[in-house]
């Protein structure tokens, strides 16, 4: 094989590697209820930072009641919108929260409507429907118009965020 053939072969292999389907490391799949069925939706993966605004509320982690809510932020996907249609979808998603238990990484981690999802995040975190509704209200009452998260000091949080696939 000549040097020019080796270069051509290498370029072909490089092109094939780039053309192969790859998962987007910036997207995470979350299972949410849309009121009719549970669907797998995509959300931008993020690790929200806390702002220090305190309000009450309890969340479970690793099967035990361990923490109180300690902060809220207004961070979310770059696609979060202050438009009324998105905010209306979030209100509809909130109204779909049932009196059940939601779990991060579980078959049902929250609810969705349109492009808005409300869900539990963190390692082995679970929350009741009442905690989900209270967190939603706290995020809104803290001035977050579109997306945001309520955080607990055990690494669990409830998030309102832009999603696709609901």
Language model feature labels by segment:
Residues 1-27, 31:
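Fungal secretory targeting signals
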Residues 3, 25, 35, 55, ...:
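Short linear motifs in intrinsically disordered/low-complexity regions
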Residues 11-13, 31, 48, 52-53, ...:
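Compositionally biased, low-complexity repeat tracts
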Residues 19-69:
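N-terminal propeptides/leader regions of secreted preproproteins
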Residues 64-166:
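Mature secreted bioactive peptide module from preproproteins
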